[in-house]
């Protein structure tokens, strides 16, 4: 019995150590994403905001003990309604919205459970209104972000980050990102993230494989 108890304790300790083995900066993830964009009304008309639901794929790779590269692609579509205070709903148009992200990050351990993270990235955003004969509207932006990743439990990680984005689509916009990962095993986990600020927002839920 003592040997069995010792074995059980050893297995539990090994499992907990595997879960709590710091923060991984090498991973792949995919799932559902929604890209939101507030739209201004035009004189005499009201235009619904874009809430483009679809998918995302993302990944990160550690290139040194302190640096990592990362990227993501998100794409969704929505039927955006147009209405008039006098005539009511006039119709709707299908809108495709996508965003690609590519960047580099620096991470530094503050303690055994908390990392400071700073990132610099490029964003390419495209919005295409089907049937308007105008072609897609796109733009490039640069984003700087800083935040922390923290293990609140051996298999639960949270992160929060502040961002500043400027360029063609974002006009000096501040935003905040918050996320959570629940590790099912040392490799597999469930992730969720939300970002908002200015007239844009993003929500995503998916599965992550950490290496």
Regions from the PLM with identified roles:
Residues 1-25:
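Cleavable N-terminal export/targeting peptides
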Residues 57-61, 102-106, 120, 146-150, ...:
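Residues on the lipid-exposed face of transmembrane beta-strands in outer-membrane beta-barrel proteins
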Residues 48-51, 94-98, 110-112, 138-140, ...:
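Solvent-exposed loop/turn segments connecting transmembrane beta-strands
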Residues 16-19, 56, 63-65, 105-110, ...:
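Outer-membrane beta-barrel proteins
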Residues 28, 65-71, 111-116, 152-160, ...:
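Repeated loop/turn-to-beta-strand initiation elements of outer-membrane beta-barrel proteins
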Residues 32-38, 65, 73-79, 98, ...:
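Transmembrane beta-strands of outer-membrane beta-barrel pores
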Residues 16-69, 73-79:
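Short glycine/proline- and aromatic-enriched beta-strand/turn motifs that initiate or cap beta-hairpins
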Residues 38-47, 79-93, 127-137, 170-175, ...:
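Outer-membrane beta-barrel translocator domains and adjoining extracellular loop/strand segments
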